[in-house]
Amino acid sequence: MGSTCSTPESKEQKRINSVIDKQIRKDEDDEIGNQKLLLLGTGECGKSTILKQINILHSSGFSKADLKNVAGTVYSNIIQGVATLLKAKDHFYYELSTPELDADAQHILSLADSSKDAMPFIPLTFNAIKRLWHDPVVQKTFERRAEFQMMDTLVYFMNELDRINNADYIPTVDDMLRIRIPTMGVVQQTIEIKGTKFRIYDVGGQRSERRKWIHLFDNVNATIFISAINEFNQKLNEDGQTNRMKESIKLFETICNSRWFVQAAMILFLNKRDLFEQKLKTTSINVLFSTYQGSNDYAECVAYIQMRFERLNKYSDIKKIYTHVTCATDTNQIQLVIDSVVDMVIGRNLRGTGME
């Protein structure tokens, strides 16, 4: 007859298996109460800014240490922004207004090419930035910014340059919202909003990053797709040829009609409305949409772009696209939008479980 006694090894294995089983059940129970939310879109559309806003509105926000830690990024963004203008100036075969500015340009370009973290500006750097920014030729280059890739918050930082140059400078929340740090890989944050836990994923939008998205597509409750509508006359950074909004529309069509998201709520943020409205003063959207015959009226142009996105929905009989026109740096407006999105997602979940 076989022995009914357990060996010490088998008892230990049973204990380990029991611990693993309990953890799996706990993870499954935790997942039931969570809402999985993806932030998707092309590079520099504002995904990370939206996540920062959610953190400000519904989590711990940013501590003084958090703000101090991004000071170097602010300095770097300014230097890189001015360097981008100088390189574009050369591309357009422009010459700086005075020979004295050439030394300033070389100083800024050498800092931009350095692999070191940006430090507080020494007087030489601060004065060079100010002189170059106010040079008519640099401003002439800036007016042609749709023809090359540059950070769209540079004007904000240049307007705040004297404050940023202060010896005891600590970035503000507004500074934090406007810094540019490309998202590499996946940033995940769990935040409780209105009694419901949301597991939010922000993934890099550059082409090279999108292959990392697929493992996140399972069991998604809602997708927020963000498109920067001011980019209708700008080229993609990755190849310098593809129109940025055309790329965004193409990506939205793929995401919206993916089998992974047929049951998920599809939310569309037409972002950077402030920059879009400003651009309409000098440029028509028919530079991209040749069939558009309307005026440069802001509301009319937004409605047309919204239609171009929403008509791509192949499941319109069973799936609605919830569209919001946003400015990601406007905390008050984003609070209203996020509250609306959260109410909608929670309501859908309650209806899906028969609890409403």
Curated annotation (Swiss-Prot):
GO cellular component: cytoplasm; heterotrimeric G-protein complex; non-motile cilium
Residue numbers spanned by region G2 motif: 175-183
Family, as annotated: Belongs to the G-alpha family.
Record's keyword terms, sorted: GTP-binding, Lipoprotein, Magnesium, Metal-binding, Myristate, Nucleotide-binding, Palmitate, Transducer
Location of the region described as G5 motif in the Swiss-Prot/TrEMBL record: 326-331
Pfam annotation, one family: G-alpha
SMART domains the UniProt entry points to: G_alpha
Name of the gene: gpa-15
Oligomeric and partner information: G proteins are composed of 3 units; alpha, beta and gamma. The alpha chain contains the guanine nucleotide binding site.
Ligand binding (Mg(2+)): S48, T183
Listed GO biological process terms: adenylate cyclase-modulating G protein-coupled receptor signaling pathway
Region described as G1 motif: 36-49
Chain sites annotated for binding GTP: 41-48, 177-183, 202-206, 271-274, 328
Ranges for region G4 motif: 267-274
Domain called G-alpha: residue spans: 33-356
InterPro entries the UniProt entry points to: Gprotein_alpha_su, GproteinA_insert, P-loop_NTPase
Free-text function comment from the UniProt entry: Guanine nucleotide-binding proteins (G proteins) are involved as modulators or transducers in various transmembrane signaling systems.
Organism: Caenorhabditis elegans
Lineage per the UniProt record: Eukaryota, Metazoa, Ecdysozoa, Nematoda, Chromadorea
GO MF annotation terms: G protein-coupled receptor binding; G-protein beta/gamma-subunit complex binding; GTP binding; GTPase activity; metal ion binding
Source domain of life: Eukaryota
Protein name: Guanine nucleotide-binding protein alpha-15 subunit
Segments of this protein annotated with the region G3 motif: 198-207
Lipid anchor positions (S-palmitoyl cysteine): C5
Residues bearing a lipid moiety (N-myristoyl glycine): G2
